[in-house]
């Protein structure tokens, strides 16, 4: 064949076998930006059904990490696949910019004590720098989106709209001021939301402490026995927060639980009977049960406060007492526990903070005032021991909430804060803050009271609590994976009132004026908030910092403005009010968003915050579906940690292997679970990528001289195997569309790899090679094959483009011959071939027969009967119904099986016999053909090759032509 090689249709392509992705990809990033590809996608999609993907904004601080990459690439895959499916797919990226981490960073760089205006200016500058830095990293991953209009929560308009949105919630009666225990970080010097907590192992000092009985006679009567005066009697509590002992205000018991009175060497001790054996075993003391009483019989008993000798505390019924650990008697400190506070509020029992905002004991506490927590705990324990009320002290390891930023344990302490109430009933329907003027304010005990009156919202539904509204709002929302629904429901059911106020400088202010005497809101709050919002929209949050109440007609002697800022989760959780509903961006269309997509930790984070703000303002969720992805772990299943040295940089992967390798790993990994990554795993991804790239290269080579406008063959002139290939292409497209639509990207990668390796590489392309290489270059047989390949290639590229974005675009540029064109401007509906069930049915018999043929050929090679399959003639024996199906395809079977000939015979079962062909071999195409005869050159050529050479010679004589393969 060597002397005929130049006469074959062996075409070239500028699409190389080696991807060299780290070098090629950055140029495509620049091209997409310069050519405004996303904007052109939106323009091309005008009038199509909208699909809105709302971005949960990452925090604008530091380099992006592998979790960011997973999140953003998944969103990009969704966006591009929805466009390919015929939607006007929209994604506006953004950043979360306010909050403690940035303010803390500015304090590190510039020191504390700066005036608020300076802090806000420096924070804004720093946040902007961080967003630009992260933007570059995100773009490097191939993300398309509305980057020119990316949002930042610190944008003036966004800040202003957040104020307006908060006022809508207040107008529905859900915002109130209360004195409640909140999560408090001594380093942040601020309250924290549940979503700002991380749970880590902590070893605490746990104590069993006795609360002495004040009246032995009353005590004895409750156990129906005579008083015992020779020993002190104590109810024993167990706590892992001994620092709260000075704040003890009551002891809680379970009403129906049995409590035993036990005689021990040093005292009479009362604990829940089911827990007594374990307790006394840990103490190692002898004990004897003297009497029993139900918890309800102990209610009202007076006990001595364990820290303050002259103070009494009562025994109360507490429904949250359990009998699975401890003593069955709970130490209640209403200033330092949510359940304690609520119970004591109902009972009229006041509580006092024993720790200040810096984590030191209150200055007025005897013996421990002003001490750091650890020192004070030691003195409390020593005092209890000296008083004879310390029953046991031990180290206790448990999961404890820590500040997500400082990694330090938080405190629970009562502070005046602003809350969105989860269980306050309000009318359903969108509130009109211009007509309504209602709020809630809570007194020192946390009880909410009305301070205004709400006018009914138009078309208001029945009153519901925010908790109930949130539950109803997600009832019909699909979750991916479905198990994520339970997490969201658990978040709703267990969520306390949302503390939305913070004591920081860099944040959106609570835009209210309160009376100096009773802290009630100004009666004109609705109009005042709009006036403040107008100023913030012009000048940012600095406008509030420098605003004097008198400028808005507020009596400064009677009112003062709040100094609190809003929780950053309220910032990001309310961003839907600006990004997709703001009149300035009315072109986005579609609210609620079609999809929210974030990590598994966002059920109590952004998912939860968005759900609560949407329901609080409008009574509905701001999303139609939720997709949750898992965290990234290393190859051994360990979480990423700098201390373990197992972190993986997405930038490094992009710079060494290519962003498409990272994208393919993300798509081929089940996001519903933890996502493992390592060099070994990435190497396997590279192998998958190479297979698909080689398939693309083969396809591009073999359509290099094909122009569908001039060369396409009508469907009626296609060979049946080409029609079958197009039918299988349509099945592949439909399967990909379905998998993308249900966000099953693992299925897409399997489909694409299987299509390249098995359907194309393992069947159709093998069957085509002879026709492509040896047939007349512009003959119908070859053009028919190219017609099918052109469609296959277009649909394959559109199908893999959401995942292998760089590679698909590189290939499309070669395929289209136009750098201005982009694969992302095309849809399946434009290119997918029509379904052809008849072709699929015909060729199902061929595909079923193929394994029998392959096995027979392998056995013939093993017996040295043949070398190449082209030297074989087959006798296919099969039942009549199979032969009837194969008969119309008989003329194509030899090419499909790559043999010299096929004979069909009837038999009861399928069997394939192989014989060596006696036919001569063509020296050009290497087929064994009856038409092989001597050529003028002296070589033996088949009739097809003689015709091809003759056509080629005439063409060369008639006019000079470019080398075969040029466009």
UniProtKB/Swiss-Prot annotation:
MF-aspect GO terms: aminoacyl-tRNA deacylase activity; ATP binding; isoleucine-tRNA ligase activity; tRNA binding; zinc ion binding
Encoding gene (name): ileS2
Annotated signal sequence range: none
Gene Ontology terms describing biological process: isoleucyl-tRNA aminoacylation
Protein name: Isoleucine--tRNA ligase 2
Localization annotation: Cytoplasm
Enzyme Commission designation: 6.1.1.5
Summary of the function given for this chain in its UniProt record: Catalyzes the attachment of isoleucine to tRNA(Ile). As IleRS can inadvertently accommodate and process structurally similar amino acids such as valine, to avoid such errors it has two additional distinct tRNA(Ile)-dependent editing activities. One activity is designated as 'pretransfer' editing and involves the hydrolysis of activated Val-AMP. The other activity is designated 'posttransfer' editing and involves deacylation of mischarged Val-tRNA(Ile).
Residue ranges of the region described as Disordered: 437-466
Domain of life: Bacteria
Sequence intervals crossing the membrane: none
Residue runs in coiled coils: none
Subunit structure: Monomer.
